[in-house]
Amino acid sequence: GYSGFDAMLLAHEIHKATNRFARVMTHHLWFVNPATAIPARKLGFEEATTENGLTLLKKNNLIILFPEGEHGNFKPSAKAYRLQEFKRGFVRMALTTQAPIIPTVIIGAEETHINLRQLKFAKYLIGGVLPLPLNVLPLPAKWKIRFFEPIYLPYKPSAANDSELVHEIAQDIQERIQNAITQELSKRDAIFF
């Protein structure tokens, strides 16, 4: 969701399970001025670039990223749980560093903060798409976070340069996650407490 609650709760769950802090790859607008950049770094946020991700992974850090990018995070709530096309950077990072990809599904974040639409014109003003939220305070949605088995890509680091392969891997992972989301939604009995 647009608020970042999903990333923070996911980081918390990872810390509980592993006793390690995961770095959260976030929208570049967090880092445009010190008023937001300083708290963002203290929260464990890093600007979502392939270079930053590679640096963190090479230092054996855990990272959290949402492959849809801003178009997924800021999509209107009318498109809830319909994944937008995955960007390819996460696959390239995994191949280059030989790090596993751990698919994760979060149910509940889409209802916690309602987004009316994307403000696409903001891209021309500030360099990024922004949401138009209905609520600032979170709604009491029930959440479920489900981790799946790690995916170890059976290719050499040089495969990161094969655009066709990278695209196929990203599509395959997106389909798996979309199917898992659909399955989890079918089990849900109520949205709110």
Language-model features, listed with the residues they occupy:
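Non-catalytic C-terminal accessory region of glycerolipid acyltransferases
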Residues: 55-193
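Catalytic core of membrane glycerolipid acyltransferases/transacylases, capturing the structured
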Residues: 1-53, 70-83
